Amino acid sequence: MKPLYIYFLAASLACTSCSDSWLDLNPSTSVPTDQAFSSLEDAQSALNGIYRLASAHSYYGDNFFYFGDCRAADVQARMTKGDGRRVSPYYEYNVKATDSFNSSLPWNQVYKVIRQTNNLIAATESGLIKTTDEAALNEIKAQALAMRGLALYDLIRVFAMPYSYDNGQSLGVPIVTTATDQSSKPARNTVAECYDQIITDLTNSLAGLSKEKKDGCLNYWAVQGILSRVYLNKLDYPNAYKAATDVIENSKSLYQLYTRDEYPTVWGKEYTSESLFEFYFSLTEPSGGSGGEGAPMVYANEEKVDWNNLILSEDYLNLLNEDPQDVRHCVTEVSAIANNEGLPE
């Protein structure tokens, strides 16, 4: 294969945004005990920390996207030296348990998110948080529930067989719904049990979530959108249709599909009209933190050492070229690296 184009703007950028005002409360990435919570501000700070953990390099900031993008048919890896091979283990289906960067790192990071959501949920139910604004506290709890459901959904998509393989009877990942020590090693649940828990968390969160658009935060419509995808993966088509239709029909005042003219320009913007939910990524913080540098840069079309790792496959380009008017032509361009360096023969 000799692909000629590279992604100009990664689809993963769809999860990039949030204004600085969203982080006015100091985000915390570690809330070890219920004693850390005594006010609504403490709870909000902990929730901010959960979103920050999810946007980190080893989750939505980088590694998580490799599992899907690199193992599918639309792109292929450029086999360059050094960190440029960050994507090749996924592309070659050669991710090993001993490879901490590619296996234990994303696993551990997602469970950090789950652990912090459990701490926050327990705190909201403990009575230790003193506030007169119960609605605000309930919404914080609802967002934590939704984030726990999303995190478990992400784990099951990466580390388990699809539900369709055997109707969910294969082993999935451990379900953790209580505040446990990070050294605990719970047993794995089945895929079906995991989907039941995901749906329970997401569904239970809906009643407490706002239907207003909240930049950088989950709201009712975002969770309904996630639920529709969960049901689709579970082969529950009636409920997938019901959840998706709710969003499409009842959120028109907040969200609109991109026009053809808008499409090429939206990927570098925050809070666009079609986006139900976007994570905040810092453009200045190193990618090992909440910086979103990692995922976009593997698609970046530039001659930078150890980046520019993924390019469009020939099959994808052939399909794209069947329609010269396809709007996706506007976000692809010829690779900056000469002679297709690093491509497999």
Residue ranges and their predicted role:
Residues 85-159, 189, 207-211:
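Conserved, well-structured interaction surfaces
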Residues 3, 18-69, 244, 307-309, ...:
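Membrane-proximal, proline-rich intrinsically disordered regions
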Residues 34, 61-82, 155, 160-169, ...:
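Short, surface-exposed recognition loops and adjoining beta-strand edges that mediate ligand/DNA contacts
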Residues 47, 114-117, 195, 202, ...:
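Inward-facing hydrophobic residues that define packing positions of alpha-helical scaffold repeats
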Residues 45, 241-345:
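Hydrophobic-face positions in mid-chain alpha helices that act as interaction patches
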Residues 1-16:
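Sec-dependent bacterial lipoprotein signal peptides
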Residues 133-135, 158-192, 196:
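Short coil/linker segments at helix-helix boundaries
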